[in-house]
Amino acid sequence: MTKKTKPETYVFSQNFPISADKARRVIDRIRGRSYEETLVILELLPYRAAYPIFKFVCFAASNASSTSTSKKENLFISKAEVNERPAIKKLKPRARGRSYPIKKATCHITIVLTDLSFYFNELVEPQQEKNLLTKLYLNLRGLWDKK
């Protein structure tokens, strides 16, 4: 009997030092896409939040491939969310011994990668499996694009 593993890999980033709106505009573009497509999109986005999210996705994919038998080609982002966090409060020194308060916005980022091959039998031929994966991926992507 083979041991069943979870088809999902989670990555949490807490207290990420960027506002939730700025991180959310990057996350909204990658939600529901495949791992490879996500990497291409994140490399080309001009936003500051794109590179750290790129690192989170790569980290999740390496965790998925090392902890289970999933391949990076079969991964897609099933869930990606950004939650606001209370602002970090600092004091900035000013002239004449005064100080002004600074509120630095932060957020929590959650990314979930799901392995599509987990949902198929091992008895399926490789060419049929590729066609099934493509159909399932296109169906899931269609759901997320209607957000």
Curated annotation (Swiss-Prot):
Keywords from the named record: Plastid, Ribonucleoprotein, Ribosomal protein, RNA-binding, rRNA-binding
Top-rank taxon: Eukaryota
A molecular function (GO) term: rRNA binding
Pfam families attached to this UniProt entry: Ribosomal_L22
CDD domains xref list: Ribosomal_L22
Subunit structure: Part of the 50S ribosomal subunit.
NCBIfam families tied to this protein: rplV_bact (TIGR01044)
Task performed by this protein: This protein binds specifically to 23S rRNA. The globular domain of the protein is located near the polypeptide exit tunnel on the outside of the subunit, while an extended beta-hairpin is found that lines the wall of the exit tunnel in the center of the 70S ribosome.
Family affiliation: Belongs to the universal ribosomal protein uL22 family.
Protein name: Large ribosomal subunit protein uL22c
